[in-house]
Amino acid sequence: MEHHAVEFTAQHLIALLPLLVTCMSAIVVMLAIAARRNHALTFVLTVLGLNLALLSLLPAMGVAPLEVTALLQIDRFAGYYMALVLAASLACVTLTHAYLGGQSGKGYPGNREELYLLILLSAAGGLVLASAQHLVGLFIGLELLSVPTYGMIAYAFFNKRSLEAGIKYMVLSAAGSAFLLFGMALLYAEAGDMGFRAIGASLAQGSSLLVELGIGMMLIGLAFKLSLVPFHLWTPDVYEGAPAPVAAFLATASKVAVFAVLLRLYQISPATAGGWLNELLTLIAIASILFGNLLALLQNNLKRLLGYSSIAHFGYLLVALIASQGLAVEAIGVYLATYVLTSLGAFGVITLMSTPYSGRDADALYEYRGLFWRRPYLTAVLTVMMLSLAGIPLTAGFIGKFYVIAAGVEAQLWWLLGAMVLGSAIGVFYYLRVMVTLFMREPNLHRHDAPFDWGQRAGGIMLLVVALLAFFLGVYPQPLLELVHNAALVALAQ
């Protein structure tokens, strides 16, 4: 790869628009906070910024595919995952607004505005990750994504659990990043270049132990961020301690971005999957599927349950990653989209049920007993989400799972498929358990509840939209499939 001076033209700027708009929004929000604290204004600015960033994807895709410096590759693949990250962030922002008080008038003790700023910064990191094609781009994106999340997790600092979760995540995340960097150093020592493509080329000539170790260590760093099995221990604690909208962000936007970059690495340099690394990934996938589902059986806390189930879901995604032929890239795109939808819905219901003033979120299962008799529509939303996570037909989750299984069959990964089917069967059980709880006749206990008019607020409207989408995509998935097909073709064509 000959190094030439980077010409930076208007086209490059257009290609970078989503990222630039997101960063500009962060700056605007920061200045607005500095000028005058106003929760509603901050919320509106953030939503505007994220919507503009989503819209700016259109002109950006117009000039794609385009290599912007050696670090970023803006193409349809990047565009698709950028859209997912931005949409997830947008949903988390509306949830944050509902969570931090909205119109309920009860003031959140402390400053509310910075949370929006952190979400914007983190989203910018996600955008960098989705388009990274270089180890440095990957690392910058990863840090920009995860550093603001430390603050977000500990945002309800007057709540001991939240603070503990933030510190725990920060320490473990640093360890994960250290592994990642070490792996990168080993790769660079061997390949002499940090671009994914160059690494792939030098790997194709023959793999040495150094390279395999380097990739293995990088995988450890990324597996930590995706909470795959041996590195999953932080997940339930952090999900439980973090404020509900932040848990939603962690489960959706941050994981999608990391998975996108992992997929890109695998697509561009297939040699990274060679040898014992493939077996290692297979083991991690099987372990994630089984552990995630089995540990979720024991949970009496909805957020912890969702944490464990997200471990299992990323185990399923690894199956498609290992298959990484034909269908697999599309399968991953579809699965991530449906997973984001359903996770946002599930965490959204928890968000609307909780207020940060009552000391902790409404995440214990008993708080949802008989919810149907008090908030029927909210219950309907949560029920659809649980069905979708379990992968029941007529919901979006089924389409994703179906595609992943199809990809696995295509690549003939029978062991992995066995684990998937077993895991899904266990999964149905604990999702049903949540649903049964919702419809129980309840003893009259006083506890916190979603406000009566939740459906007329930003957060509630977003939830209803998500529920309808989850159902609609389950019945008529064609639009999503076409989108993903376009994005996947580009990834394979390179």
Curated annotation (Swiss-Prot):
- Please indicate if the UniProt record lists Cell membrane as a keyword: yes
**UniProt keyword list:** Cell inner membrane, Cell membrane, Membrane, NAD, Quinone, Translocase, Transmembrane, Transmembrane helix, Transport, Ubiquinone
Q: What is one GO cellular-component annotation here?
A: plasma membrane
The record lists the catalysed reaction(s) as: a quinone + NADH + 5 H(+)(in) = a quinol + NAD(+) + 4 H(+)(out)
Q: Where in the cell is it found?
A: Cell inner membrane
Q: Where does the UniProt entry say this protein principally localizes? A: membrane
The transmembrane segments are 13-33, 43-63, 82-102, 117-137, 138-158, 169-189, 209-229, 243-263, 277-297, 311-331, 332-352, 380-400, 412-432, 461-481
For whether the record's keyword set contains tRNA-binding, the answer is no
Q: How does it sit in the membrane?
A: Multi-pass membrane protein
**InterPro entries named among the record's database cross-references:** NADH-Q_OxRdtase_suN/2, ND/Mrp_TM
Which BP terms from GO are recorded?
ATP synthesis coupled electron transport
Kindly list the GO molecular function terms attached to this UniProt entry. Answer: NADH dehydrogenase (ubiquinone) activity; NADH:ubiquinone reductase (non-electrogenic) activity; quinone binding
* E.C. number: 7.1.1.-
Q: Which HAMAP family does its entry note?
A: NDH1_NuoN_1 (MF_00445)
**Subunit structure comment from the entry:** NDH-1 is composed of 13 different subunits. Subunits NuoA, H, J, K, L, M, N constitute the membrane sector of the complex.
Family named by the database record: Belongs to the complex I subunit 2 family.
* Function of the protein: NDH-1 shuttles electrons from NADH, via FMN and iron-sulfur (Fe-S) centers, to quinones in the respiratory chain. The immediate electron acceptor for the enzyme in this species is believed to be ubiquinone. Couples the redox reaction to proton translocation (for every two electrons transferred, four hydrogen ions are translocated across the cytoplasmic membrane), and thus conserves the redox energy in a proton gradient.
Name this polypeptide is given? NADH-quinone oxidoreductase subunit N
Q: Which organism is it from?
A: Ectopseudomonas mendocina (strain ymp) (Pseudomonas mendocina)
- Gene for this chain: nuoN
